Amino acid sequence: MKWVNHEIVTGVIVYGATGDFLATAFSMAGAIFPDKVEGKPGANYWSWRARHRGWSHWPVLYIAILAIMQLGLLPQGADVERGATFICIGALLHIAEDAFCGKVPLFLPWQKVGIKLFTVGSVMEYLFAMAVVILTYIIHAQVMVK
C-alpha cells in the first residue's frame, strides 16, 4: 500500500478502537516504520525490491517487542511504553494491510504469505482504504450506541 493509505487506515482503526489522539499519532508513526527502515529504492530498484517486505515486515519482531515490554522492562503505564506499544501496533497493522496487496513474512522472515486483492497505487487500493474507513466507522457507531 501507499504510505498515505497506511496512515489513513491505521489511524482510523486505532482512533476508532481507542478514541485517543496520542495513541493514533503513535500508531500512524508505526504505520510507516516497516517501509521507512528499508529506505528508498533509488537507482538499484530491483535490488531494493528483492529485499522489500523482509525482516522489517516480520510480525514476530513487533510481537516480541510487545511481549518484552509486558515483562516489565518499562514501567507499566509509562509514556514511553505506551508510545512503543502503539508504534508496534501501527507496524503490525501496516503488515496486515500489506498482506492484502502482496506477500509478507509470517512465522519465518523468509516465508511470505498474503493475497493480492489489488496492486499498490491502483484505484482498488484507494477503494479498499475507503471501505476500511467506512467499516470502522460503522463498527464504532454500533459500539457507541450500545
Named regions from a protein language model:
Residues 1-146:
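N-terminal membrane-targeting hydrophobic helices
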